[in-house]
Design a protein with these regions (language model features):
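Sec-dependent bacterial lipoprotein signal peptides
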Residues: 1-16
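Bacterial signal peptide processing site
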Residues: 18-21
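N-terminal secretory signal peptides
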Residues: 34-102, 106, 110-113
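Solvent-exposed coil/turn segments that connect beta secondary-structure elements
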Residues: 72-74, 110, 128-132, 141-143, ...
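Mid-length scaffold segments of soluble, non-membrane domains
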Residues: 92-148
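Surface-exposed, gly/pro-biased binding rims or lids
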Residues: 143-188
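Short, exposed beta-strand-loop hairpins at the edges of beta-sheets
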Residues: 189-196
């Protein structure tokens, strides 16, 4: 019960954090210190009200500046999350890393994400879950709808790169997909992707 209350409160707080002021630049535009502040504008294809998977955000603080990850949060609801036929997310296939919109990283500084060098700006983050490791896909395109069918050859051509990270297990069952940051010093952190009993760590460091 307490976990359900926590998820509901977090979703409401995330929705407020994901709504930019009226004069904010659109996603894909920021390239400086304001990137985190303008993050998380929901795509127009689906109204936020009534979504089964709430729109939320995670903040990553590196070197005193904040990046923000914006994503939809689906829940297991008694279903098998990662697996074969009938699972919410099929193994070995491209996934938007959440629900509805693709997951978006808004970055106000130069960084490395799992070894990929990134300049300030906005990027969509897809993943390909495998049994023991995940492929992380970073793309410069952020305006497409998140469904994997929308990942056309034209959008794939805008990829920054693909990297592989190991997949582990969570200490307890995670009902609702969660992205959070775990600091590793002043200029480094791990982005943790957690759902069901799976945990994936994506290392992130700030570059000079």
């Amino acid at each position: 019960m307490y976990r359900q209350i926590y998820v509901a409160v977090a979703a409401l707080a995330g929705l407020a954090a994901c709504t930019p002021p009226a004069d904010s630049p659109t996603p894909g535009q920021p390239a400086g210190a304001a990137a985190a502040a303008v993050a998380c504008q929901p795509a127009p294809q689906m109204a936020v009200a009534g979504r089964a998977s709430p729109y939320d955000s995670a903040v990553v603080t590196l070197g005193g500046a904040q990046a923000k990850v914006c994503y939809g949060r689906p829940s297991a609801r008694g279903r098998t999350v990662f697996g074969g036929e009938g699972a919410v997310v099929a193994l070995d296939t491209l996934w938007r890393t959440g629900a509805n919109e693709p997951t978006i990283l808004h970055l106000p500084f130069r960084a490395q994400l799992a070894g990929l060098a990134l300049e300030p700006g906005s990027y969509s983050i897809y993943t390909v879950p495998h049994a023991n490791q995940w492929t992380v896909v970073v793309n410069r395109s952020t305006s497409q709808w998140g469904h994997e069918r929308s990942y056309t050859p034209e959008i794939r051509a805008q990829e920054v790169g693909r990297v592989t990270v190991p997949a582990g297990r969570t200490a307890e069952f995670v009902e609702t997909f969660t992205i959070r940051a775990q600091p590793r010093g002043a200029n480094a952190a791990d982005l943790l992707l957690e759902w069901e009993n799976t945990q994936v760590r994506i290392p992130m460091t700030r570059r000079a």
